Amino acid sequence: MSKVGVIGAGKWGSALAFALSEKCEVYITSRTPRDMKNFVSLEEILRLEYLVIAIPAQQVSSWLREHFIYNNHKVLVAAKGIEATSGKFLNEIYEEHVPNEKIAFLSGPSFATEVMKSLPTALVINSINEELSAEFACFFPSFIKTYTSTDIAGAEVAGAYKNVIAIAAGICEGLGLGKNAAASLISRGLVEMQRFGKVYGAKDESFIGLSGAGDLFLTASSTMSRNFRVGLGIAEGKSKEQIVEELGEVAEGIGTTYALYSIAKEKDLYLPIAREVYYMLEGLDPHVSLRNFLSN
């Protein structure tokens, strides 16, 4: 039985530790000590060959610099997002510390609460090293169907961008604009993130599969989604600071929105949904912003 170390004991990290424990000997660690089975120190985790890292995107760079020493690990990254300060995708950040052929990225539609209930789930493991993807795929339980892909760019763009669309969808729901408007917003969001993905060499098929459309439809249509709930808060007139405090969890879409806004300005890209979400996070009246977008 393979030993796997999970770094990050939030909802998603804990859910993955639960799922992987069916076939693996799993250990877990986090910044804050937890009263959990198989909770160990980071030093013990880093002695293992297989690592699953579920650290939020905005914390990854500092954590890698301060705590991570590569020791021939095989790494599966289980977070999605773009670093707001640098505009870097997670693969760009991790590849500064881990060889490309030793790292994979997890994507696809997955709520942690449903994984914890062993409900059917499908995920994609993305890596340039197909043998590595196959290794990690073998660790997942029967209720999680895994697929593999080499399109890291597609998985990274889709996984990050869908959180921004989910914020917009939450605003749409909170304003009571109806299901017609929501369907229009989500489908246009899919086109927007696919167009953005081409800038990074992403493949079109990734956006119509689990990593793209699948994850987008899940995240942008349910109050189980943190980013959707951010949108609901904006529709209620709350500031992003108030929303984050009430949420008590990381909503990756906020940092990703700011990153996309900066990238769009730098590269002169037309990203209307990301732009409007940025304006609304900055305090623009959502009644004005979203209605104007939907009518144009």
Curated annotation (Swiss-Prot):
GO terms for molecular function: glycerol-3-phosphate dehydrogenase [NAD(P)+] activity; NAD binding. Pathway: Membrane lipid metabolism; glycerophospholipid metabolism. It catalyses: sn-glycerol 3-phosphate + NAD(+) = dihydroxyacetone phosphate + NADH + H(+); sn-glycerol 3-phosphate + NADP(+) = dihydroxyacetone phosphate + NADPH + H(+). Keywords: Cytoplasm, Lipid biosynthesis, Lipid metabolism, NAD, NADP, Nucleotide-binding, Oxidoreductase, Phospholipid biosynthesis, Phospholipid metabolism. NADPH binds at W12, R31, K80, A112, R226, V250, E252. GO terms for cellular component: cytosol. It is found in: Cytoplasm. This is Glycerol-3-phosphate dehydrogenase [NAD(P)+]. It is an enzyme of class 1 (oxidoreductase). GO terms for biological process: carbohydrate metabolic process; glycerol-3-phosphate biosynthetic process; glycerol-3-phosphate catabolic process; glycerophospholipid metabolic process; phospholipid biosynthetic process. PANTHER family: GLYCEROL-3-PHOSPHATE DEHYDROGENASE, GLYCEROL-3-PHOSPHATE DEHYDROGENASE [NAD(+)] 2, CHLOROPLASTIC. It comes from Sulfurimonas denitrificans (strain ATCC 33889 / DSM 1251). It comes from the Bacteria. Its main location: cytoplasm. SUPFAM superfamilies: 6-phosphogluconate dehydrogenase C-terminal domain-like, NAD(P)-binding Rossmann-fold domains. The keyword Nucleotide-binding applies.
